[in-house]
Design a protein with these regions (language model features):
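Short hydrophobic beta-strand element within catalytic cores of glycosyltransferases
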Residues: 326-330, 336-340
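Non-catalytic membrane-proximal stalk/linker segments that position and tether the catalytic domains
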Residues: 1-47, 53, 86, 93
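C-terminal alpha-helical cap of glycosyltransferases
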Residues: 394-407
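Conserved catalytic-core segment of nucleotide-activated headgroup transferases in glycan assembly
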Residues: 53-58, 189, 193, 207-211, ...
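Membrane-proximal helix-turn-helix segments that form the acceptor-binding/catalytic region
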Residues: 157, 172-194
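A short, well-ordered alpha-helix in the C-terminal region of glycosyltransferases
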Residues: 377-391, 403
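Acidic donor-binding loop of glycosyltransferase active sites
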Residues: 122-123, 192, 305-322, 333-335
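Conserved acidic donor-binding segment of nucleotide-sugar-dependent glycosyltransferases
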Residues: 355-361, 370-375
Length: 407
């Protein structure tokens, strides 16, 4: 046995000892089942105010609860690291959240044990992300051969990694992309339902997996916020804003590209323009970009106040896949933005395409300068946001989610 395995074993022993001391007992009767029961497994307890995938999954959970579906949530965390500030938040919503406990014999009830115990009563297992489906689908199906297996792609990982390879020419990325393609296609074969997050991902998947009737589209949920008296006009706004978690490589690349290539061109025209970068899990290489005009604000719990004083949102994403929550979030608040084709994927910008979308460094800089200084174009872009978001309404998504559960 390796030293790492021994350390993990010892930490698990200490956890079990602590649970015994505190009398944290597992009782199946503490969990609420109903006529329809859904098991959701993700890498983490969704951090809905930190990343787009977590926000989307949280909204799906809320829709399930609204429709009287019992939800059981499991995170693929190590037993001795099974901690999250978000566990209680989901419990407060009415979600059955797995947490380590001990059985009547004093044995640790692991997440795998929990899955085996509840799955005979589960109707649908919603496995979120490729590695989660690959890891847990067999365990779930063995515990209940009749369970409906849902593979939620979140985004087409193969496409995201391949695009990154095409940008950086790193052979390791190409190998990683090919690895994920095998995982994702195997998952598609084993799933009863495959969820793509955008029409683009769905069409790209067709090139590799032709069982189209299995694949459904469930995108992000974005509700446009109607302008009120508190909505700040063009004249009362300043600065650029980028939002994104730095656990996600496309965000790190976009911020470096913005600072090192795009903004020097913008600053020639608008020397005092400030850029605010909001996002959790900031790394050392991102910290090194900070300056008086390029502010790293870290994690901000409530973005509303920042968004309502910002003049322009920027997202110069050079690779990625799926729907970008940051784009929808900007549109929700009628905040004009400048992004790339990758950033805009899944959204129909219509007549605003030529105003808000650019794919070269010079064009990105030009569009930022134009929208930051041109009130007429800014107002038109702001007023177009509601129409762009229409396909992402809660009513549309609710119908799609309920179809997956009941059909």
């Amino acid at each position: 046995m390796s030293l790492k395995s021994l350390k993990n074993q010892f930490k698990t022993y200490l956890l079990t000892k602590k649970l015994k001391k505190n009398n944290i007992l597992f009782n199946l009767n503490d969990f609420k089942f109903s006529d329809k029961n859904v098991l959701i497994i993700d890498e983490i307890i969704p951090e809905f105010n930190k990343d787009s995938g977590s926000r989307r999954l949280t909204e799906i959970i809320k829709l399930l609860l609204k429709n009287k579906v019992s939800v059981f949530l499991v995170a693929d965390l190590k037993q001795y690291k099974y901690k999250s500030d978000y566990i209680q938040k989901f419990k407060d919503l009415g979600v059955n959240v797995y947490q380590p406990s001990i059985d009547q014999k004093g044995q640790l009830v692991t997440k795998e044990d929990f899955i085996k115990l509840i799955t005979p009563k589960i109707d649908v297992a919603w496995l979120h992300r490729p590695t989660i489906f690959s890891k847990f689908q067999s365990l779930v199906k063995t515990a209940n051969p009749n369970v409906k297996l849902v593979f939620d792609m979140v985004d087409f990982h193969y496409v995201r990694l391949l695009r990154e390879y095409e940008l950086n020419k790193d052979e390791a990325l190409k190998a990683e992309a090919e690895k994920f393609l095998k995982i994702e296609l195997e998952n598609c074969k084993n799933a009863d339902v495959v969820i793509a997050i955008s029409t683009t991902d769905k069409e790209l998947l067709k090139q590799h997996f032709n069982t189209d009737e299995k694949v459904v589209l469930i995108s992000n949920i974005h509700q446009h916020i109607d302008k009120s008296d508190n909505f700040n006009s063009f004249e009362n706004r300043n600065d650029l804003l980028f939002v994104g978690s730095f656990r996600h490589d496309p965000n790190s690349d976009a911020v470096k590209y913005l600072k090192e290539d795009v903004m020097p061109l913008v600053w020639k025209d608008i020397p005092d323009l400030k850029v605010n970068i909001i996002g959790s899990y900031i790394t050392e290489d991102i910290e090194a970009l900070a300056s008086d005009k390029f502010k790293l604000l870290g994690f901000v719990d409530d973005l509303n106040a920042v968004i309502n004083t910002t003049k322009l949102f920027v997202a110069p994403l050079r690779f990625g896949a799926g729907i970008k929550g940051k784009i929808g979030q900007s549109l929700e608040h009628s905040l004009p933005l400048v992004t790339t084709n990758v950033g805009a994927e899944g959204f129909d910008f219509g007549e605003q395409t030529n105003v808000m979308i650019a794919n070269t460094t010079n064009d990105l800089a030009d569009k930022i300068i134009n929208l930051y200084t041109n009130k007429a174009d800014w107002d038109l872009a702001s007023n177009s946001c509601k129409a762009i978001l229409k396909p992402f309404s809660i009513n549309t998504t609710e119908a799609q989610v309920i179809d997956v559960i009941y059909k």
